[in-house]
């Protein structure tokens, strides 16, 4: 079974554990996901079955949009509502002041990923090491904030909707935001509502060709695709180097053109 859809991962489960429940639900062991959410976070997770598990690298998965609740005045080792070490009653902020900081934190931001993150360290998730008390040195990174808006402010809780680049950590955004206010803050909730064009719609099966980040190409002799025969650049409509998809009635293939040579990256992937 070939299938790709946006699932909704609940809070409290790792992405791997959630995938295991979907494998049982759909009775299919060949499954995968893209865009790991750590156990604290909930929301959209791109899931694929069958041959479609090979398509993740071709999908357009950015920008990503999240809803987050910042709990102002709270210090947590994990920058969420676990591992809380201190809660302070702080004065309420004026909304224009909060908006000013939101506006300042647009564009490219430098940060260090949090210890409690889904980033891998020698094959192990950072949050798994952090739970064991193992400190790791995470390299500084950059993320791009495309948009951020305040949804509501009911002190000490600030609700925002933020759209960011791939690889961004909302925990780190929260930490930097709080630093500009001169306080501590942590997340009390985090939900991914959109990943590229993927939004949750009851696990509805999607037409993957509408979600891959490739241009179409065309060939007159479609039998070549059916048989996996060698393709020459001259037989294609577009000759520029790069990756393309070519579709037939029942299948599609992904090819690469480089130095006037055509190479199959994936061939005869059955449409769902």
UniProtKB/Swiss-Prot annotation:
Disulfides per UniProt: none
**Organism's domain of life?**
Bacteria
Database matches in HAMAP family? TruB_bact (MF_01080)
Signal peptide region: none
Please report the organism this UniProt entry assigns to the protein: Campylobacter jejuni subsp. jejuni serotype O:2 (strain ATCC 700819 / NCTC 11168)
Q: What is its EC number?
A: 5.4.99.25
Q: Which Pfam family, giving just one, matches this sequence? A: TruB_N
Q: Where does the record place the catalytic residues? A: 38
Question: What job does the chain carry out?
Answer: Responsible for synthesis of pseudouridine from uracil-55 in the psi GC loop of transfer RNAs.
Picking any one GO molecular function of the record gives: RNA binding
Name of the protein described by the UniProt record: tRNA pseudouridine synthase B
Record keywords: Isomerase, tRNA processing
Coiled-coil spans in chain: none
Q: Which reaction does it catalyse?
A: uridine(55) in tRNA = pseudouridine(55) in tRNA
Q: Which family does it belong to?
A: Belongs to the pseudouridine synthase TruB family. Type 1 subfamily.
Mind telling me which SUPFAM superfamilies this protein's record contains? Pseudouridine synthase
> Which InterPro entries does the entry link to?
PsdUridine_synth_cat_dom_sf, PsdUridine_synth_N, tRNA_psdUridine_synth_TruB
| GO BP term (any one) | mRNA pseudouridine synthesis
């Amino acid at each position: 079974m070939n299938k790709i859809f946006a699932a909704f991962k609940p809070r409290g489960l790792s992405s791997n554990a959630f995938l295991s429940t979907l494998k049982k639900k759909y009775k299919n062991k060949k499954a995968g996901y893209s865009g790991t959410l750590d156990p604290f976070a909930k929301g959209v997770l791109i899931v694929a079955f069958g041959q479609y598990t090979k398509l993740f690298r071709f999908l357009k998965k950015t920008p990503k949009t999240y809803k987050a609740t910042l709990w102002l005045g709270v210090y947590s080792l994990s920058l969420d509502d676990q591992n809380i070490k201190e809660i302070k009653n702080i004065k309420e902020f004026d909304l224009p002041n909060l908006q000013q900081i939101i506006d300042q934190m647009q564009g490219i931001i430098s940060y260090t990923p949090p210890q409690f993150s889904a980033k891998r360290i020698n094959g192990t998730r950072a949050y798994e090491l952090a739970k064991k008390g193992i400190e790791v040195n995470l390299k500084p990174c950059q993320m791009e904030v495309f948009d951020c808006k305040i949804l509501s402010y009911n002190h000490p809780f600030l609700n925002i909707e933020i759209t960011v680049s791939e690889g961004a950590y909302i925990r780190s955004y929260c930490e930097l935001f709080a630093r500009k206010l001169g306080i501590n803050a942590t997340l009390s909730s985090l939900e991914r509502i959109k990943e590229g064009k993927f939004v949750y719609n009851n696990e509805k099966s999607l037409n993957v060709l509408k979600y891959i980040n490739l241009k179409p190409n065309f060939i007159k002799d479609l039998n070549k695709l059916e048989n996996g025969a060698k393709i020459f650049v001259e037989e294609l409509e577009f000759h520029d180097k790069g990756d393309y998809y070519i579709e037939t009635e029942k299948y599609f293939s992904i090819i690469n053109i480089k130095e006037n040579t055509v190479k199959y990256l994936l061939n005869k992937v059955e449409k769902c």
